UniProtKB/Swiss-Prot annotation:
Domains SOFL-A and SOFL-B are required for function in cytokinin-mediated development. Residues 37-60, 78-104 are annotated as: Disordered. A motif (SOFL-A) lies at residues 14-19. It comes from the Eukaryota. Its main location: cytoplasm. One of its GO terms (cellular component) is nucleus. Expressed in seedlings, flowers and siliques. Barely detectable in roots and leaves. It is found in: Cytoplasm; Nucleus. This is Protein SOB FIVE-LIKE 6.
């Protein structure tokens, strides 16, 4: 394959090389404060200039007709204004929600939830209370039914007597019912 006839393989400068070459050859004007003269220097150090691109330079030569530009701009502005109105409405709704539920004086750690969340909070509290009551009654029944081997606990809590009283109480209830 012969690469000599391809555009990007010629020895010409790429876009970066031409840009960097132009920027490095710009003449600099300095004012000498001691003599009051303006000196012109040429910076021709090309050691930092490199050809970073291997392809041909690309130039944008397309012209945009003014009519198309105006039409696109008008369409864009109209669509943006419609979106702004929707966004404003959404922001107002969100602000109203946050104002109802978040007061700057409320402490979120100690304050109760407001609105629909209150019923969920109460329901959760009720479930927790039922669980807590169940645990206490279960552990009380367990203590009453088991024999305790410690002499101190037997003196402080006559477990056998409590267990017998509870059993006797159950029998009395059955007889009444």
């Amino acid at each position: 394959m012969d690469f000599s006839d391809l555009d990007y393989s010629d020895a010409g400068d790429s876009g970066w090389t031409m840009y960097l070459g132009h920027s490095s050859s710009v003449s600099l004007h300095h004012f000498d404060y001691h003599n009051g003269e303006t000196k012109q220097e040429h910076d021709e150090d090309s050691s930092m200039v490199s050809d970073a691109s291997s392809g041909p330079p690309y130039y944008c030569e397309e012209t945009v007709h003014e009519d198309h530009l105006q039409q696109n701009t008008q369409y864009w502005c109209k669509s943006k204004s419609k979106n702004k109105n929707k966004n404003k409405k959404k922001v107002h709704e969100e602000q109203g929600y946050s104002e109802r539920f978040n007061s700057s004086f409320d402490d979120t750690a100690s304050s109760l939830p407001v609105g629909e969340e209150v019923s969920a909070h109460k329901q959760h509290q009720n479930q927790y209370q039922r669980f807590h009551d169940f645990c206490q009654s279960y552990s009380t029944r367990r203590i009453c039914k088991e024999k305790v081997n410690s002499g101190f606990l037997q003196q402080a809590f006559p477990v056998d007597k409590l267990a017998l009283d509870n059993q006797g109480g159950d029998n009395q209830r059955k007889r009444r019912g």
